[in-house]
Every structure is written in structure tokens, then in C-alpha cells.
Amino acid sequence: MAPLLVPLKCGFHMQRRKLSLLLQRSSAVQAWTFHDHRAANKRKERNTYLLSDPSRESSTWANNRGQNSQQILEAVKHLHLQERQCWHGNAGGGLSADPKNVLKEVNSSKILGAMFTYVWPKDRPDLRARVVISLSLLAGAKITNVMVPFMFKYAVDSLNQMSGHMLNLSDAPNTVVTMATAVLIGYGVSRTGSALFNELRNAVFGKVAQSSIRRIAKNVFLHLHNLDLGFHLSRQTGALSKAIDRGTRGISFVLSALVFNLGPTLFEMMLVSGILYYKCGGHFALVTLGTLSAYTAFTVAVTQWRTQFRIEMNKADNEAGNAAIDSLLNYETVKYFNNEKYEAERYDGFLKVYESSSLKTTSTLAMLNFGQSAIFSVGLTAIMVLASKGIMSGTMTVGDLVMVNGLLFQLSLPLNFLGTVYRETRQALIDMNTLFTLLSVDTKIKEKEMAPPLIVTPQEATIRFEDVYFEYLEGQKVLNGVSFEVPAGKKVAIVGGSGSGKSTIVRLLFRFYEPQQGNIYIAGQNIRDVGLESLRKAVGVVPQDAVLFHNTIFYNLMYGNINATAEDVYRVARLAGIHDAILKMPHKYDTQVGERGLKLSGGEKQRVAIARAILKNPPILLYDEATSSLDSVTEENILTSMKEMVKDRTSVFIAHRLSTIVDADEIIVLNQGKVAERGNHQTLLDTPGSLYANLWNTQNSRILSNGSKPEPVPERVSQKEEERKKLQEEIMNSVKGCGNCSC
């Protein structure tokens, strides 16, 4: 099939990763993408929009007749790009962006069963005692609450007993008045007692609920850290965070609903039905149960029907928000192609859908409220008619009528919220589904049972790759039978073109991934056979993009060894050549580095990364293009720090700039996933037609064409670009909801 060309002039950019996912989903669609600058490569997947809705597409098409707009719409129509992935498992979304890795959902019964283990933990007898006390207080509150209508009944009967069918206080004896007064006081005590039991129940059960939420959230957090790197690379971190947040809030709501609403209401319904059956007869209980059943069935059915309108409303709201934010963030692009009218009409299309769905939501809510009132009124009227007949026949008193009326009206209050509670409980279970589905995900990188720790010293820290094959996607080999050895205490560099597998070697060595074939050894021990913690403790990494925590410089330095002393931190800062720069900062080591370290320059961030790697003090050090984004002056200073650091250590340098690894003991050149050349710098240069010599000459010719020295990369400009991308990401993440469910 002829490929669909998406030209650059249309202003439409798409990630390569997004393209690969599209090609996996539909083999009939092929696309070529162009990238105008580095920021375009890193745009979020949700910056593309689904415009396949015929009604929305036709309205937009009619109002925009510019050729550029039509090209964009035509491209989107054929590609069927999705705006975002829903994290609610029962709402048409999924936890995985990869269709080959769709996670199995956890049904509601398993969710409630798993939640019960946290509410009734075997190792916490204090929490179990609180649950028992809470249930006892619940029963006490409902029994006391049911006593209130009885107090009314006795008061009315006492005041009415001397006057027949007419209530006449002037003729009532003092004893009757005294008894009625006592009964009315009992009524007040009953109401007060019911409120007291309810509040005590809330106070006692609060610790159980919060402890359950904390333990579940902690377990999910630890589980996510134990999952393999492939899982995290295929997910949006913001979506994971929202999934955990929604799931924990869902747990809180379900516990509250079960303990404070659904459970008490069900108990009170059974209690009232039993009382009416015992005091008034089976027909009273039958009418009551029939009314409550019809009320519940109507509420559940209408609420389920209304949910679709709520979903449509939220989806349109999210789409309108995303469209507005994306349009404003791309203000210049809109101006370049005169598409202001197109953007406005597109935005208005989403608002029209929102308006229509909102009206449906409001009107169906009115219908729900009316239906509930009608059902309850019919049932209450039937009960009152039966009670009146009983009074006329002499089998019931006026007090019985008051009691029956009071019992039913007490039930009406929690029943009024049944629709809301049902809808929110249903949504909470969906949110919890996502949370517990995350817990059910199994990592691909598993540690063997009773695996011994890796035993390695700097003198024995050899690294050996033995016929290693690896592929991220089936059929696309990244490493194709790679074998090499790094002697202990030596510096070995790995170079090659983009996609040759350089960074993959670092990930395999750290066991972020497993090779499909072959073995990797450290100090003669297969890394598959040793404990993960000991393996990763023995290897230090200085990444290309040093990401720092939003905390102080001291915290980020100490992160290399959280048990280190302050003097140790200062020592490694001096070794990395950043100590003096820190002392010049306003708050010195207490200076906040900002989100991802954006308040520091690129060189400062790399020095912090080097310092904390020194503080870790591992026998093996890996440098993954640690200076590729820095200017030559900063790079030279950092390389000097690295030389001091790698003395007597086994070190592997993944390099893009060959000038940084000329002093390596051995250089390994990768080409198409294989070891193409090996040797030191001079040996490889002296080899006629070698890949290394070609790379060296190419890089030198670029430097010479730009002058005697390579032009420095303006760090502050790069920093501003990072800040801009960060701001854009935060704005996009601020759009709440997934649009595929009633969140």
C-alpha cells in the first residue's frame, strides 16, 4: 500500500514511538514523519487528537475551507490517532499503550476480597478490634435510631388513651402527661444516642480506613519500583500517578460507603421490615420491601443509563480543554497557517457536544429525582392506608400510624443518596480496578529464589558479554551475538552510530532487560544467578541526562549513599569539582535544584551525578554519553573529574564524541548490533578504512569547518528549552479526567 506522506508544511508532527504503535495496531496504515527540531521528538502522545467522529468532523470541515486545514484533517482521518489512553480498566481504556501487553482486569469480587485483607489484617489486632467496635457502634446507632419512632408512638398513645380517638390534653390525667413527657424525653435521648454512636463509629473506623489506604498505596508504590524498565517506558508517569491517586481515593470512598451508607441502610431496611412484620403484620412488611426494591431497582437502572451522558460530558470537556491548551501552546503555528477560525470552530465543536451532554445529564437527574419521590410516595401512601384501616378496625392505634410513618421517613434520607452512592461506588470500583491491576502486573526481570549476592571487589570486577542477542521488538535485533570482556580496573569505551546498541549494553548490565540469548558475567558470576540488589549496588551509572530530585543539592548528592555523613558528601563534591560552585550559591548545599534539576546548568547537573556516583563507591562505573550535551570547556573539566574517579576501577564509557575516550585502554566499535572493531585509539586510527577512523575524521572535519574549536552549546538556552517543555508538560497534565469514564 502506498505510504501516506505527512508533509512538514502541514504543521503536523508525530512521535516515532506513536508511529510504531499505530503500525502495530493496523498493518494497513503506513506513515512517514519528519521532525523539525528536538522538542518535536519528545512531544506527548496525547498532543494528537481523535477526529474520527463523523458529526464533529463534518461540522469542522464545513467551517474551514483552507487547504492547510483540510490536509491536516485528511491526515488525521486516515491515521485515526488517539488523544490519550484511559486508565480505567472497565471504561474502554487500558493500562498499556502496547496492544500486545493488555493487562487482565481484576473483577470487583477479587478487589473487595483483597481490600478485606487490608481492613482485617492478620498482623494488626488493634485494627481488628476497631472494626469490631465500629460494627457494634453501627448496630447500636441503627437500633437507637429505630427507637425514635417508637418513642413517638408511646407518646401519642399515652396522650390519647383517655380521650378515645380525639387528642385532648386538658382531660388527660397528670400521670398520662407525666408518662408522655418521659417518653418524649426518651425520644430526645434516642436521637442523641444515635448521633453519638454514629460519630464514635466514624472516629473509631477512621484509623482502619486510613491505615488500609496507606498500606495499599505503599505496596503499589514498591511494586511499581520493582517492575522492569520496559513497563515504565511504555507508560505515562502522570497517568500512573493519577491511577494510584484515584485508586486510593476509591478505596476511601468504598470503605465509607460500605461502613457509613450502604451497610447501615441495608441493616436498617431489614430491621424496619422485621419490626413491621412483627408489630403490624406481613402485608406491611411486604409493601415496605416492595417499595424499597422498586426504589432501588429504579435508581440503579436510571443511574446506569445516565452514566453514558456523564461520560460523554466529561469526554467532551477533556477534549475541549486539550484542544484549547494545545492550540494556545502552538500559538505561533496557528498564526503561520492562518488557522484561527479553524481552531475556534474545532474548539466550539467540543463545547457543543459538552452542552448537549450536560443538558441530558441535568434532565435525566430531574427524572431520577421525580421517579424516586413517586415510588416512595406510592409506598408510603399504601402503608398509611393500611394503618388507617387498622385503626378503624381497632387492631392499631394512632401511635402505630405515627411509628410506621416515622420508620419509613427515616429510611428515605439514606435512600435519597442511593443513586449518588451507587454511581460513585461503581466509579470507585473502576478506579480500584486500575490500582489492583497494577498490583497484578508481574515483572519480567525476576530474581531466582535464594539467589546469592554478587561478590565482587575492584580487583576482580571483570565484565564479560558472551554471545549476547537482544531485541526490544520481535524481529528487530539490537545486539546480534555481542561478545567482549572488560578486564578489572581497565577503562573500555563503546562507540558506534545511533541504534548500534551502545546504551542497550548499559541497560542489560544493570538488568533492566534480559537478553534473549547469551550470558553476562561480572567477576565470573552470571548476573541472572545473583541477587538484584547486590548487582545494582556493585554498578554505578552516570547517565547522559542527569535527572535530579526536586530537593536540595545536599539531598541529591547524598542520594548516592543515604547513610553517608556530611563530610563524605563534601568530599565527593570536591572530587567532582562542584564544591566551590555550591558555596557561591545563596543557600549553599541547601539550595533547591528545582524540578529535574532545572535550576542548575548542564555542567553542574553532571557534576552532581558524578559526585553521587563516587559516593556510591561501586567497583564498576558506567558512563552513558555523560558529556554529549555539554560545551567543550565544561566537558573537559568534567572529564578531568572522571579521570580521578575511575582510577583502579572497572569503567565502561558509552561515547558519542570520540575525543572523550582517546585515553581508553580499549575501544569497542559496534555496527548493526555486532562488534565490528576493537583496539586502542591509535591502533584503530592506523587501520585503513576502519569505522572508527571514519567516525574520527568525520567529527574532526565538522570541528574544522566551524573553526579551530567546536562552538560551545549555550547551556542557558538549553535550560530555557527544558523549562519550556516542562511547563508544557505540566499544562497538559493539568487536564483532569480520561474522557472514557465518569471520572
From Swiss-Prot:
Gene3D superfamilies: ABC transporter type 1, transmembrane domain (1.20.1560.10), P-loop containing nucleotide triphosphate hydrolases (3.40.50.300). SMART domains: AAA. It holds the Pfam family ABC_membrane. Residues 153-168, 272-281, 386-400 are mitochondrial intermembrane. Keywords: ATP-binding, Membrane, Mitochondrion, Mitochondrion inner membrane, Nucleotide-binding, Transit peptide, Transmembrane, Transmembrane helix, Transport. Residues 712-724 have a biased composition (Basic and acidic residues). The keyword Cell membrane does not apply. Residues 1-19 form a transit peptide. It is a multi-pass membrane protein. GO terms for molecular function: ABC-type iron-sulfur cluster transporter activity; ATP binding; ATP hydrolysis activity; ATPase-coupled transmembrane transporter activity. Homodimer. This is Iron-sulfur clusters transporter ABCB7, mitochondrial. It comes from Danio rerio (Zebrafish).
